[in-house]
């Protein structure tokens, strides 16, 4: 009895002869071992696996499945693809053809798929940021906080001259703050207000000297007139009080003219530097 138990197989024999049971043995239902007993053996190839449907290639048991790819098969030809201008990856533009640019899913940078709008152009910053600006722009700044690079686009192709005339004038040095500014009013009244200190000065000495002499002579004449009027009407002033008012009026005019002459004499003078055209 013990010998029969030792010779019994480790796996029970299949009920149906070998294809569908849990215990599988070699062909013919048994395999002869070295000691005359039965030993388990591998099933025939394909006996334990259901057949694949027709039209699909079989995958071997030890073979890995093909890698997953989100891209559409080239055989379908339904999804339009473009190449990223930064990392050269493929970008699916299906449903995005109405846009001017698309974003790459690998490098997160924009790539144009259409021409820029009329009057605009695309510029790629060295940090790979895609910018859009006017065709006539010569300098643009990158908006990214960590870049802020100023990009010089260079001169644009020649076109018609600008209808706005170039500023014509003289560069002068302010007599107050010594800063340089442009003076464009070519008139006899050579007064100019400095845009830096907002103070008025004269361009050259000719105009304030002329005004100073005129005001001084007029004030001197009024002073002489007031003196003569006072001596000539001294006796009548005691009788007519209005004569005192005439004296005061003439004296006031003389003082104003002499004060104006002093103002022109003390005015700061701004000196021209060079012509500007």
UniProtKB/Swiss-Prot annotation:
It comes from Homo sapiens (Human). The chain crosses the membrane at residues 212-232, 242-262. Induction: By sterol depletion. It catalyses: a 1,2-diacyl-sn-glycero-3-phospho-(1D-myo-inositol-4,5-bisphosphate) + H2O = a 1,2-diacyl-sn-glycero-3-phospho-(1D-myo-inositol-5-phosphate) + phosphate. Ubiquitous. Its EC number is 3.1.3.78. It comes from the Eukaryota. Residues 1-74 are annotated as: Disordered. Residues 17-38 have a biased composition (Gly residues). It is found in: Late endosome membrane; Lysosome membrane; Cytoplasmic vesicle, Phagosome membrane; Cell membrane. GO terms for cellular component: late endosome membrane; lysosomal membrane; nucleoplasm; phagocytic vesicle membrane; plasma membrane. This is Type 1 phosphatidylinositol 4,5-bisphosphate 4-phosphatase. Keywords: Cell membrane, Cytoplasmic vesicle, Endosome, Hydrolase, Lipid metabolism, Lysosome, Membrane, Phosphoprotein, Transmembrane, Transmembrane helix. A motif (CX5R motif) lies at residues 133-139. Signal peptide: none annotated. Interacts (via transmembrane domain) with ATP6V0D1. Interacts with LAMTOR1. Interacts with RRAGA and RRAGC. It is a multi-pass membrane protein. The active site is at residue 133. One of its GO terms (biological process) is phospholipid metabolic process. Catalyzes the hydrolysis of phosphatidylinositol-4,5-bisphosphate (PtdIns-4,5-P2) to phosphatidylinositol-4-phosphate (PtdIns-4-P). Does not hydrolyze phosphatidylinositol 3,4,5-trisphosphate, phosphatidylinositol 3,4-bisphosphate, inositol 3,5-bisphosphate, inositol 3,4-bisphosphate, phosphatidylinositol 5-monophosphate, phosphatidylinositol 4-monophosphate and phosphatidylinositol 3-monophosphate. Regulates lysosomal positioning by recruiting JIP4 to lysosomal membranes, thus inducing retrograde transport of lysosomes along microtubules. GO terms for molecular function: phosphatidylinositol-4,5-bisphosphate 4-phosphatase activity. Its main location: membrane. Pfam families: Tmemb_55A.
């Amino acid at each position: 009895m013990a010998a029969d138990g030792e010779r019994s197989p480790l796996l029970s024999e299949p009920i149906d002869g070998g294809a569908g049971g849990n215990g599988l043995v070699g062909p013919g239902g048994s395999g002869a071992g070295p000691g005359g007993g039965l030993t388990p053996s591998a099933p025939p190839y394909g006996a334990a696996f259901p057949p694949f449907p027709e039209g699909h290639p079989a995958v071997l048991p030890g073979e890995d499945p093909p890698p997953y790819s989100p891209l559409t098969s080239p055989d379908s030809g339904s999804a339009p693809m473009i190449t990223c201008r930064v990392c050269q990856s493929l970008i699916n533009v299906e449903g995005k053809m109405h846009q001017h640019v698309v974003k790459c899913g690998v490098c997160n940078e924009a790539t144009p798929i259409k021409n820029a709008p009329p009057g605009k152009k695309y510029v790629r910053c060295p940090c790979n940021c895609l910018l859009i600006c006017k065709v006539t722009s010569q300098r643009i700044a990158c908006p990214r906080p960590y870049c802020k690079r100023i990009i010089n686009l260079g001169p644009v192709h020649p076109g018609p001259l600008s209808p706005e005339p170039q500023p014509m004038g003289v560069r002068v040095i302010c007599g107050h703050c010594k800063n340089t500014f442009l003076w464009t009013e070519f008139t006899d009244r050579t007064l100019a207000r400095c845009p830096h200190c907002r103070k008025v000065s004269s361009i050259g000495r000719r105009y304030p000297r002329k005004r100073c002499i005129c005001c001084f002579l007029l004030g001197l004449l009024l002073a002489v007139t007031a003196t003569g009027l006072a001596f000539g009407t001294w006796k009548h002033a005691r009788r007519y009080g209005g004569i005192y008012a005439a004296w005061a009026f003439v004296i006031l005019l003389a003082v104003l003219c002499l004060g104006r002459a002093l103002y022109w004499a003390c005015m700061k003078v701004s000196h021209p530097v060079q012509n500007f055209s």
